[in-house]
Amino acid sequence: MSAIFNFQSLLTVILLLICTCAYIRSLAPSLLDKNKSGLLGIFWKCARIGERKSPYVAVCCVVMAFSILFMQ
């Protein structure tokens, strides 16, 4: 089943996108900072969410990991 139609898979993809963008921005900030608008601006926005809401994103990742490992 596609991640678009399964809510848990969609949340997993969004969390992975946020975490990956925040990690890439911590390694090479200029890579994401030059595209703040347009289609590629989504990655910059995900990186900002990952930086500013870091504790909440971490808790969501842990909860998602436990739900995938133990509830399926």
Swiss-Prot record:
It is found in: Golgi apparatus membrane. Pfam families: DUF1242 (PF06842). GO terms for biological process: constitutive secretory pathway. Glycans are attached at N35. The keyword Manganese does not apply. Residues 1-26 form the signal peptide. Keywords: Glycoprotein, Golgi apparatus, Membrane, Signal, Transmembrane, Transmembrane helix. Residues 27-53 are extracellular. The chain crosses the membrane at residues 54-71. InterPro entries: KISH_domain, Ksh1. Residues 72 are cytoplasmic. It is a single-pass type I membrane protein. GO terms for cellular component: Golgi membrane. Involved in the early part of the secretory pathway. Belongs to the KISH family. This is Protein kish-A.
